[in-house]
Curated annotation (Swiss-Prot):
<feature type="region of interest" description="Disordered">
    <location>
        <begin position="289"/>
        <end position="309"/>
    </location>
</feature>
<dbReference type="GO" id="GO:0016787">
    <property type="term" value="F:hydrolase activity"/>
</dbReference>
<feature type="active site" description="For amidase activity">
    <location>
        <position position="420"/>
    </location>
</feature>
<dbReference type="InterPro" id="IPR048974">
    <property type="entry name" value="PlyCA_N"/>
</dbReference>
<dbReference type="InterPro" id="IPR007921">
    <property type="entry name" value="CHAP_dom"/>
</dbReference>
<keyword id="KW-0578">Host cell lysis by virus</keyword>
<feature type="active site" description="For amidase activity">
    <location>
        <position position="333"/>
    </location>
</feature>
<dbReference type="Pfam" id="PF21480">
    <property type="entry name" value="PlyCA_N"/>
</dbReference>
<keyword id="KW-0378">Hydrolase</keyword>
<feature type="compositionally biased region" description="Polar residues">
    <location>
        <begin position="289"/>
        <end position="307"/>
    </location>
</feature>
<protein>
    <recommendedName>
        <fullName>Endolysin PlyC, large catalytic subunit</fullName>
        <ecNumber>3.2.1.-</ecNumber>
        <ecNumber>3.5.1.28</ecNumber>
    </recommendedName>
</protein>
<feature type="compositionally biased region" description="Polar residues">
    <location>
        <begin position="213"/>
        <end position="226"/>
    </location>
</feature>
<comment type="function">
    <text>Component of the endolysin PlyC that degrades the host peptidoglycans and participates with the holin protein in the sequential events which lead to the programmed host cell lysis releasing the mature viral particles. Once the holin has permeabilized the host cell membrane, the endolysin can reach the periplasm and breaking down the peptidoglycan layer. When associated with the small subunit PlyCB, the large subunit PlyCA displays 2 catalytic activities, amidase and glycosyl hydrolase. Cleaves the amide bond between N-acetyl muramic acid and L-alanine in the host peptidoglycan.</text>
</comment>
<keyword id="KW-0204">Cytolysis</keyword>
<keyword id="KW-0929">Antimicrobial</keyword>
<dbReference type="GO" id="GO:0031640">
    <property type="term" value="P:killing of cells of another organism"/>
</dbReference>
<dbReference type="Pfam" id="PF05257">
    <property type="entry name" value="CHAP"/>
</dbReference>
Length: 465
């Protein structure tokens, strides 16, 4: 895992003048803004549309010498609308959208005129530890004034942390107060590139606002490509067609999204599992165009080199037990069993572990379907499936087996719609002991449950031959 852009590129982007529009017209940026999910709260709260953006709101930004391109990106990736446009304030400070906008622009001028320290903490998060102590402030102090970095660096922890405290972010993944957020600087840079701008020199790449990454080429789209596009569209729609669950306090979430409540607005971020699922869906669509789709597109250590399943479980069980108290991968239960399967059979089912991936053949999102959603046959495993209306059997249990629990199970897991998963450590006639992650946001823990209750929740097992 590495930064998406180089340190030099991030710094060049943040050193751009805060009034730089990157050669994009008000209409181009207004049209982009209206199509962004993160703009919906502002659109709904203040009645914003492309027309009044161009006629009313953007001229106000220009009056204050603030780039409409940068300001509207800031709004989108903060999910503004709870506290004015950019969510600097907890609640709206004006009676309408224009007043709220003007107060945000006045805040930006205040940041330019008064020193505010770089943000490396937030109310809901632990402070981040820099990779190179003091490097962020040294860069911040070196800026000539009225740059975009002068606005962003004292205002948002997330981008600063991922650029200047990268190792902290990688090693402290999880729900708040850990690192639950992505990098808004990446999102801003990506958006500028998509609109045809050069984030690092401040100009336009194409000069006509077209996406530089889209070639002209052959405009003919094959029927198979169109079919794959429709499959991907449907899969993405299904992926996001789930409710957010109330986790605690102001926090909500599901396996796709994390959300924190600001007044009446939920600020949402894509989870690593959500991103992983999207990447896998895209990979699967690409796989369907492979002339030999039956051949796995990932490589793993040869199974003969790994020894028998029981030997591999025995060799790795102590390692798994040593992870108790730690967050693995993105902190989800899915990542934990992905980490385990990679060590025992050479393949993972979670991108967040950084291991070779099994091919996806079905449901790659829900923990209750892990045994059916991935092509375990290439990993020399055994699959036990318990159809709806049946319960697990004690005689099927194996040390090191991955178990899958049903959605909305009640005791002992009280699962939501995604179910749950973990690793069997041991069992007796009356109890079972498992290693699991993300019980109410927990790291890897050891839990002991009533055996019959545990068996009643099972949808399947994955054992290692």
């Amino acid at each position: 895992m590495s930064k998406k852009y180089t340190q030099q590129q991030y710094e060049k982007y943040l050193a751009q003048p805060a009034n730089n529009t990157f050669g994009l017209s008000p209409q181009q940026v207004a049209d982009w803004f209206m199509g962004q999910a993160g703009a919906r709260p502002v659109i709904n709260s203040y009645g914003v549309n492309a027309s009044n953006l161009v006629s009313t709101y953007i001229p106000k930004m220009q009056e204050y010498g603030v780039s409409y391109t940068l300001f509207l990106m800031y709004t989108v990736f903060e999910g503004g609308g709870a506290g004015n446009w950019i969510n600097h304030y907890m609640y709206d400070t004006g009676s309408n959208g224009l007043e709220c906008l003007e107060h945000d622009l006045q805040y930006i001028h205040g940041v330019w005129e008064t020193y505010f320290p770089p943000a490396l903490s937030a109310p809901e998060c632990y402070p981040a530890t820099e990779d190179n102590a003091g490097a962020l402030d040294r860069f911040y102090q070196s800026l000539p004034g009225r740059t975009w970095g002068d606005v962003m660096i004292p205002s948002t922890m997330a981008g600063n942390a991922w650029v200047w405290a990268y190792n902290y972010c990688v090693n402290n993944q999880g729900a708040a107060p850990l690192v639950y957020f992505g990098n808004p600087y990446d999102s801003q840079i990506d958006s500028l590139l998509a609109m045809g701008a050069d984030p690092f020199t401040g100009g336009s790449i194409t000069g006509d606002g077209k996406n530089p990454s889209v070639g002209t080429g052959n405009a003919t789209v094959s029927a198979s490509s169109e079919a794959n596009r429709e499959k991907l569209k449907k899969a993405l729609t299904d992926l996001f067609n789930n409710n957010l669950e109330h986790l605690s306090g102001e926090f909500y979430g599901n396996q796709v999204l994390n959300a924190m409540k600001y007044g009446t607005i939920l600020k949402c971020d894509l989870t690593d599992d959500g991103l992983n699922a999207i990447l896998q869906l895209i990979a699967d669509v690409n796989l369907q165009t492979n002339p030999n789709p039956d051949k796995p597109t990932v490589q793993s250590p040869g199974q003969n080199d790994l020894g028998s399943g029981s030997d591999r479980v025995a060799a790795n069980l102590a390692n798994a037990q040593a992870q108790v108290g730690k967050y693995i991968g993105d902190g989800q239960c899915y990542a934990w069993v992905g980490w385990w399967s990679a060590r025992v059979c050479g393949y993972s089912i979670s991108y967040s572990t950084g291991d070779p991936m099994l091919p996806l053949i079905g449901d790659g999102m829900n923990a209750h379907s892990i045994h059916l959603g991935w092509d375990w046959s290439i990993a020399n495993t055994g699959i036990v499936n318990y159809p709806v209306g049946t319960v697990g059997r004690k005689e099927d249990l194996r040390v090191g087996a991955i178990w899958c629990a049903t959605a909305f199970s009640g005791a002992p897991f009280y699962t939501g719609q995604y179910g749950h998963t973990g690793i069997i450590e041991s069992w007796s006639d009356t109890t079972v002991t498992v290693l699991e992650q993300n019980i109410l946001g927990s790291p890897v823990i050891r839990s002991t449950y009533d055996l019959n209750t545990f068996l009643s929740t099972l949808t399947g097992l994955i054992t290692f031959k």
